[in-house]
Amino acid sequence: MIGILNRWRQFGRRYFWPHLLLGMVAASFGLPQASAHDGTTLAETSARSLNIGSATRIDRLVMLQESARRSSFSVDYWHQHAIRTVIRHLSFSLTPSVSTVAATVPLEAHKLALLDTLNALLTHEARPPVIIRHTTQRQVSSSPRHHIGLWLAQVCGIRAGPPSALS
């Protein structure tokens, strides 16, 4: 009886939950985040953003355009958690097992590229691009503040060049 329960638990951990998470993430890719207070659909929001007559003031029109533009960057916490979990499961399943047979056969290039991409997606936080407008150049002085040769000659009594240059 315990063996059956252990096998069912292993089956759930290996197959059921990762595939369920993968299905949830795959189904939710490309869909905008649905807010709880707004019951509009995609067609209504696109029609409303294109209808200039409904926006009475220009600042409201700008806010509508910015909200439509920013909606692709808003990611729900649980959606992001599910994506990271699926990426982690995929990266563990694609990692080769350490054995003598697996060590002799190298991984194909596409598997290595996929592992690198999954690692980058898992470790780097996605942020929208930001334009940096105010940049200042650093002032670099051409003459060094401290001459080692002068210090050696004055403090230690060691001459590091001709006597006319040191005095």
Swiss-Prot record:
The keyword Cytoplasm applies. GO terms for molecular function: translation regulator activity. GO terms for cellular component: cytosol; periplasmic space. It is found in: Cytoplasm, Cytosol; Periplasm. Keywords: Cytoplasm, Periplasm, Signal. Pfam families: SecM. Residues 1-36 form the signal peptide. Regulates secA expression by translational coupling of the secM secA operon. Translational pausing at a specific Pro residue 5 residues before the end of the protein may allow disruption of a mRNA repressor helix that normally suppresses secA translation initiation. Belongs to the SecM family. This is Secretion monitor. It comes from Erwinia tasmaniensis (strain DSM 17950 / CFBP 7177 / CIP 109463 / NCPPB 4357 / Et1/99).
